[in-house]
């Protein structure tokens, strides 16, 4: 079960694609995904040696729901996402009647709030259920709210409050967690959450990986600058502002910060100017 899955992308779609395209080198996969990236998937799969092991099933949603998904913070999406997960469960049930499965894997989205229903299918047919990697941090660090606007402070504190309630009280989350043969935690914070709220030990496995590459070590001792690369979405949660503030406070004229990502670039450009580091 991989709601967002696409080659050539980052974030959730790229994460899921890298999981399934690499698992397919060792396993035959039956992958249920949303239909937004169907064209990309069907263009690339035939070019892969392991493509013969990748069988995609599509459960598409409307363009309006897709916009809600991409607009992170639009909580209306969870209603439709839950409905999508139920339809996916029914589709998976039909697939299991035809194909023999060894594992049911709930891959993404990685947030714990919506665990899908493959755990229920596991209860019904006895096929082992695996969940994760899962992001189950119990709170956004409130120290990061320093300098944030009132709206952001209220939103993040409300989110922290609701997250705590869901970790303690969500029946479906707890059922999924206890049905799982294994849960992979995407972070040490998530590990602590599963242990604290559900008494479950979960191995640590970050959702993103990398391809091991060998490059010659370059001697950079003669460089005039110290270059730092920051990659991410330019929004409050990723704390680019903290990186800019750190550069400003360092007072190091040789420090250069290279920023790659999408989002509110104008805001962070003006913030850099206000710190007097726009040329860095």
Where do the PLM segments sit?
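Acceptor-binding helix/loop patch of EC 2.4 sugar-transfer enzymes
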Residues: 3, 63-75, 127-171
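A conserved catalytic-core segment of Leloir-type glycosyltransferases
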Residues: 30-87, 92
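An aromatic- and histidine-rich active-site surface loop
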Residues: 80-89, 103-147
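Donor nucleotide-sugar binding/catalytic pocket of nucleotide-sugar-dependent glycosyltransferases
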Residues: 54-57, 156-217
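N-terminal subdomain of nucleotide-sugar transferases
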Residues: 1-52, 123-127, 182
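Nucleotide-activated donor-binding/catalytic signature segment of Leloir-type glycosyltransferases, i.e.
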Residues: 268-280
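Conserved donor-binding/catalytic core segment of Leloir-type glycosyltransferases
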Residues: 134, 219-238, 244-249, 258
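Glycosyltransferase donor-sugar binding loop
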Residues: 231, 255-269
């Amino acid at each position: 079960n991989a709601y967002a899955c696409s080659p050539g992308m980052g974030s959730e779609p790229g994460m899921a694609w890298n999981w399934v395209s690499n698992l397919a080198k060792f396993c035959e996969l039956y992958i249920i995904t949303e239909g937004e990236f169907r064209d990309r998937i069907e263009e690339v799969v035939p070019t892969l040696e392991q493509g013969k092991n990748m069988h995609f099933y599509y459960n598409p949603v409307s363009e309006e729901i897709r916009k809600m998904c991409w607009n992170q913070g639009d909580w209306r999406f969870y209603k439709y996402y839950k409905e999508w997960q139920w339809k996916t469960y029914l589709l998976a049930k039909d697939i299991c009647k035809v194909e023999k499965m060894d594992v049911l894997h709930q891959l993404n989205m990685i947030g714990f709030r919506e665990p899908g229903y493959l755990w229920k299918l596991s209860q019904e047919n006895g096929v082992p259920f695996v969940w994760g990697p899962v992001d189950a941090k119990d709170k956004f660090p409130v120290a990061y709210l320093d300098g944030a606007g009132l709206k952001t402070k209220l939103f993040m504190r409300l989110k922290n409050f609701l997250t705590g309630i869901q970790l303690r009280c969500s029946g479906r989350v707890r059922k999924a967690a206890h049905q799982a043969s294994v849960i992979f935690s995407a972070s040490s914070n998530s590990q602590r959450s599963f242990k604290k709220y559900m008494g479950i030990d979960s191995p640590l496995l970050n959702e993103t990986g990398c391809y091991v590459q060998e490059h010659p070590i370059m001697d950079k001792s003669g460089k005039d600058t110290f270059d730092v690369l920051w990659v991410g979405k330019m929004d409050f949660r990723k704390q680019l502002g903290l990186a800019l503030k750190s550069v400003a406070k360092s007072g190091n004229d040789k420090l250069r910060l290279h920023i790659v990502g999408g989002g509110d670039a104008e805001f962070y450009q003006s913030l850099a100017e206000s710190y007097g580091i726009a040329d860095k």
